[in-house]
């Protein structure tokens, strides 16, 4: 069916005959004869040029059609010059062509030729085209306004007719189309029938179409133009005559609006499918602002807002057309749950809630983390490409080369820097303190007791006065205002034990000295071995960390082993490229063995805690995994087992970067010099330790896998309250251990019966821990295949089946198969670097 705006009696017949160019497959101009058009000419008084609309192109020219409808004028006065009117129309068409070219509508020239040369008029098609234009643009007018416009145009075309129109339908009727009364003129009906019998018409034998139904439940979506930039196939569920149908189950996932797609030029199409917060903000800011304005207009003007739609909330995405290859769920703007009430078990996922492994650091501040709802391997939800898998994304990117370790570390540093902006005040305070410390560090020339200043000698206590004579080199004797502990010790009761507390730890006082060389600044941490102090080395003029071991005989032997291991590792890695803490020196002071090392930052458990136990982005976890494996490779190259891998023993070497170093070799041993049979922290304890089996370097691989899982989720993978519960959590995922391990276990009777079946185990909440009832994918709440495969190879019952360090470094999870650099949003700002 063809919709007309106006006709002209003054156009020469040559122009009418010259318009024999094909309009579309829907209507052939050869079928439009003078006899066909004569009924309408008899009733036409317009002196404007003819505008013929092709409904096969209405979705491609919807905005132009709306502008033409709004620009229709009343009949010119009798004395008005026809040439001026024609010139005005020609100028208007030139502006429309310029607007069409700007919007990328490449078929406007053919449409304009049809507009200027055809000589038909019918208003029924005009109403359909006008309605579809409004649906496509998301700005469906008020039915009253549409009806009034129809009446005005009908009056303009037939000023002498006396048509009567039906009552204007209200919004409650939910009838988006207006109907003409049954009192249509005979000429009008005859013209409609003749047009419908043309090829493509509703009454054409090859494609009969249903008549317009008054039941809105049978409405269907208008068919999208095949010329649309984002369209490839016309929807078979569409019908121009029947109009849009109501939203049902089949429309819960549908294509994006042609209104939104028409504003996106093909040159920017790839940029627009990416999330604006991830992509180049400078290129998408204007488009995003325009999209937000149109969305607000849709909420204000759409008639579906007041219509009950089978428990489906209104969304501007309800007016949708396109091909089924790109679908998106209905965006429930009004009923979207808040972040605090988000249910991780719900199937609902708000748009933009998933990120890829190489995700933008700027979005990490607003996305949920595992074990809540984070999905690391899926592509960012977009209105055009939500259904594309990661495999298709990688193929589309065309980059399957492994990611270099340097690139991985740089990308993780960028993400870690943006994570640090959450605690900007704390990080800046730490950076400033460390900066002042380093600026105050000045190397001092050593002096003997005979060359000391009188002022320093007067500051010595009675105990120090006798003690200092045993030191040949003196660098620091304590700050002036320091309340030294030695002042409280009488000379006749001098004993090294008086400097210790009840646990054997040294009583460190800020401003006091160690070995008349190191100035105590602060206490960094404490443990079963003793404590770690932040100090200034006045000999080297640098800030160091000193591990002060407890004054207990049982710790002395292992401390000497630790010193030997640190020395060996530093000699094997002189360039400091394998992420192991740097050993500087060691000494014995007042009954305490002290190990001097470089000063590092927070441990990874503190990082998880500062992130509210929500876990870290996968790219950061991958970076930590790479660095940890490099450290383990160095250890195994020197036949060393760490024996106590846990997040607390992995420290950041820089507060703003994802760089870590392995520390605490107090439980470490060489392969042939195993000291303990019961070691490792419980959450990271290998099964062979629990079962009392022989152990080797493989226990570090088990602990390493547990650490990566905890970094990703924010909570321990196997949080057993005791060894029995710990074994129950492991069997929940891995099932019972092999019979070979049970038979060789020295503690098998505590956990298994004579047939190797595990005894019933309950956790602290009296929940029965049933073997083989959970998976890594469930515990980690992710489907990242390479990460899950990596963990499954680290966590095996039999140590011989676990992945080796060399194989782990070549695993797909470490190497990666895609490299998409994370981008920092314009709103974020980098924190200052630490002073050198």
From Swiss-Prot:
Highest taxon in the source lineage: Eukaryota
PROSITE patterns reported for this sequence: PROTEIN_KINASE_ATP, PROTEIN_KINASE_DOM, PROTEIN_KINASE_ST
GO cellular component: cell division site; cytoplasm; cytoskeleton; mitochondrion; mitotic actomyosin contractile ring
Catalytic activity field: L-seryl-[protein] + ATP = O-phospho-L-seryl-[protein] + ADP + H(+); L-threonyl-[protein] + ATP = O-phospho-L-threonyl-[protein] + ADP + H(+)
Subcellular location field: Cytoplasm
Enzyme superclass (EC): transferase
Region named Disordered: 1-29, 192-214, 230-307, 328-381
Biased composition range(s): Basic residues: 338-347
PTM sites of type Phosphotyrosine: 678
Domain Protein kinase: 518-814
Active site, UniProt feature: 644 (proton acceptor)
UniProt EC number: 2.7.11.1
GO MF annotation list: ATP binding; protein kinase activity; protein serine kinase activity; protein serine/threonine kinase activity
Family: Belongs to the protein kinase superfamily. CMGC Ser/Thr protein kinase family. MNB/DYRK subfamily.
Primary role: Has a role in meiosis.
PANTHER family the record matches: DUAL SPECIFICITY PROTEIN KINASE, DUAL SPECIFICITY TYROSINE-PHOSPHORYLATION-REGULATED KINASE 4
Protein name, entry field: Serine/threonine-protein kinase ppk5
Encoding gene per record: ppk5
């Amino acid at each position: 069916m063809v919709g007309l705006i106006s006709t002209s009696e003054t156009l020469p017949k040559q122009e009418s005959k010259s318009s024999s160019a094909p309009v579309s497959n829907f209507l052939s101009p050869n079928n439009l004869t003078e006899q066909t058009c004569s009924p309408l000419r008899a009733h036409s008084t317009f002196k404007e040029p003819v505008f013929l609309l092709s409904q096969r192109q209405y979705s491609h020219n919807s905005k132009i059609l709306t502008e033409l409808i709004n620009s229709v004028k009343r009949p010119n006065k009798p004395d008005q010059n026809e040439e001026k009117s024609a010139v005005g129309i020609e100028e208007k068409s030139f502006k429309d062509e310029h607007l069409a070219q700007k919007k990328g509508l490449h078929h406007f020239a053919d449409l304009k030729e049809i507009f200027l040369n055809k000589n038909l008029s019918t208003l029924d098609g005009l109403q359909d085209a006008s309605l579809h234009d409004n649906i496509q643009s998301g700005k469906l007018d008020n039915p009253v306004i549409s009806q009034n416009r129809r009446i005005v145009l009908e009056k303009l075309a037939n000023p002498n007719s006396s048509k009567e129109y039906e009552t204007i339908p209200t919004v409650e009727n939910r009838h988006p189309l207006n109907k003409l009364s049954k009192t249509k003129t005979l000429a009008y009906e005859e013209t409609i029938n003749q047009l419908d019998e043309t090829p493509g018409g509703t009454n054409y034998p090859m494609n009969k179409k249903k008549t317009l139904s008054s039941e809105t439940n049978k409405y269907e979506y208008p068919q999208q133009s095949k010329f649309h930039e984002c369209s490839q196939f016309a929807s078979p569920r569409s019908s121009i005559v029947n109009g849009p149908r109501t939203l049902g189950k089949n429309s819960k996932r549908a294509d994006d609006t042609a209104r939104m797609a028409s504003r996106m030029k093909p040159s920017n199409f790839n940029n627009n499918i990416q999330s604006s917060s991830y992509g180049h903000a400078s290129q998408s800011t204007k488009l995003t602002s325009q999209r937000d304005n149109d969305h607000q207009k849709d909420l204000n003007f759409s008639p579906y807002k007041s219509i009950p739609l089978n428990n489906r909330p209104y969304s501007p995405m309800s007016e949708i057309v396109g091909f089924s290859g790109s679908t998106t769920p209905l965006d429930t703007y009004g009923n979207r749950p808040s972040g605090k009430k988000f249910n991780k078990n719900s199937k609902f996922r708000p748009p933009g809630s998933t990120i890829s492994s190489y995700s933008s650091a700027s979005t990490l501040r607003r996305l949920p983390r595992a074990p809540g709802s984070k999905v690391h391997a899926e592509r960012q939800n977009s209105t055009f490409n939500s259904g594309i898998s990661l495999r298709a994304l990688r193929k589309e990117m065309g980059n399957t080369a492994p990611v270099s370790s340097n690139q991985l570390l740089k990308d993780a540093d960028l993400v870690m820097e943006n994570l640090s902006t959450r605690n900007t005040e704390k990080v800046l305070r730490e950076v400033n303190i460390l900066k002042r410390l380093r600026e105050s560090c000045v190397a001092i020339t050593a002096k003997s007791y005979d060359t000391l200043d009188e002022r320093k000698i007067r500051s010595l206590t009675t105990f120090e006065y006798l003690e200092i004579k045993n030191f040949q080199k003196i660098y620091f004797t304590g700050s002036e205002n320091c309340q030294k502990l030695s002042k409280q010790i009488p000379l006749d009761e001098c004993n090294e034990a008086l400097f210790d507390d009840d646990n054997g730890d040294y009583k460190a006082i800020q401003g006091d000295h160690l070995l008349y060389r190191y100035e105590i600044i602060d206490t960094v941490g404490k443990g079963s071995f003793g404590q770690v102090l932040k100090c200034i080395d006045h000999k080297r003029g640098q800030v160091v960390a000193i591990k002060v071991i407890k004054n207990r005989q049982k710790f002395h032997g292992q401390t000497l082993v630790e010193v030997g291991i640190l020395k060996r590792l530093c000699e094997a890695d002189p360039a400091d490229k394998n992420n192991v803490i740097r050993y500087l020196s060691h000494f014995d002071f007042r009954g305490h063995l002290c190990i001097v090392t470089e000063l590092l930052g927070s441990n990874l458990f503190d990082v998880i805690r500062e992130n509210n136990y929500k876990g870290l982005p996968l790219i950061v976890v991958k970076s930590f995994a790479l660095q940890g494996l490099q450290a383990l490779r160095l250890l195994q190259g020197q036949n060393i087992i760490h024996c106590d891998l846990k997040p607390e023993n992995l420290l950041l070497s820089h507060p703003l970067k994802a760089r870590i170093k392995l520390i605490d070799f107090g439980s470490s041993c060489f392969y042939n010099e195993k000291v303990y049979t019961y070691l490792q922290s419980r959450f990271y304890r290998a099964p062979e330790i629990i079962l009392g089996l022989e152990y080797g370097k493989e226990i570090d691989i088990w602990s390493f896998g547990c650490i990566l899982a905890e970094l990703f989720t924010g909570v321990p993978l196997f949080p057993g309250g005791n060894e029995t519960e710990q074994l129950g959590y492991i069997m929940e995922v891995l099932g019972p251990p092999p019979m070979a391990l049970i038979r060789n276990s020295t503690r098998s009777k505590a956990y298994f019966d004579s047939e190797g079946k595990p005894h019933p185990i309950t956790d602290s909440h009296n929940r029965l821990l049933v073997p083989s009832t959970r998976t890594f994918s469930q515990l980690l709440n992710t489907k990242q295949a390479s990460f899950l495969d990596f963990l499954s190879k680290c966590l095996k019952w039999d140590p011989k089946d676990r992945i080796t360090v060399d194989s782990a470094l070549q695993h797909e999870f470490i190497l990666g198969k895609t490299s998409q650099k994370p981008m920092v949003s314009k709103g974020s700002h980098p924190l200052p670097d630490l002073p050198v």
